[in-house]
């Protein structure tokens, strides 16, 4: 029984006038939210609602956060514009991606608007201290202490990240955007682009690490 978590949740509830709302984007083959994550969000007293931007047209004004979990098909041009408009007006988002052979130019454009790109392929780890169960694609990255990860670091927890894509920080980023690394591989990691290969070892054409697997991005907006 997670007594401490439940108590914290109760305190947050009675001290908050309104229940924060997290909208989960749907309509593009997104993953269903993991039950453990859903429980944690609900314990933090956040209301979870689904969002179809094709029918709604924009992110609702009462959104406290937009959750985009690994779309397998691309968002539309209008959805891309709606998401960027929401973020550029102070909105918050949690965005995840999985490896896919599908082109996702509009989804990628949202990421690139904030200075990051998805690496091609899946990241493998060459340092056996940074992967689990003897599988070099079950990554155990270094957790860097940021506002988003300080509790995980201070608690001494590990994060397991299987079948991950690397995140590339772009060179040309506007001055108002700050990108901080949360999860990073060792410098022996590599991203395999040929997933039909007969070997898990690094080959010609594989991108050399280290890689970010998770980042936090903030932008300073004019008042």
Regions found by a protein language model. Name each.
Residues 1-223:
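Short, surface-exposed patches at the edges or C-terminal ends of soluble domains, predominantly
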């Amino acid at each position: 029984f997670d007594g401490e978590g439940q108590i914290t949740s109760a305190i947050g509830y009675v001290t908050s006038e309104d229940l924060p709302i997290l909208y989960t984007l749907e309509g593009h083959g997104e993953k269903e939210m993991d039950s453990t994550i859903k429980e944690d969000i609900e314990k933090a007293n956040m209301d979870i609602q689904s969002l179809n931007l094709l029918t709604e047209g924009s992110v609702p004004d009462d959104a406290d956060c937009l959750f985009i979990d690994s779309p397998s098909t691309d968002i539309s041009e209008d959805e891309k514009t709606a998401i960027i408009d929401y973020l550029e007006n102070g909105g918050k988002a949690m965005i995840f991606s999985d490896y896919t052979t599908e082109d996702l130019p509009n989804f990628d454009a949202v990421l690139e608007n904030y200075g990051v790109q998805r690496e091609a392929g899946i990241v493998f780890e060459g340092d056996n201290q940074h992967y689990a169960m003897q599988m070099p694609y079950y990554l155990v990255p270094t957790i860097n202490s940021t506002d988003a990860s300080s509790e995980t670091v201070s608690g001494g927890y590990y994060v397991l990240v299987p079948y991950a894509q690397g995140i590339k920080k772009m060179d040309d980023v506007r001055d108002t955007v700050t990108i901080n690394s949360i999860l990073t591989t060792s410098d022996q990691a590599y991203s395999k682009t040929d997933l039909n290969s007969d070997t898990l070892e690094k080959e010609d054409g594989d991108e050399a690490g280290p890689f970010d697997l998770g980042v936090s991005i903030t932008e300073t907006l004019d008042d």
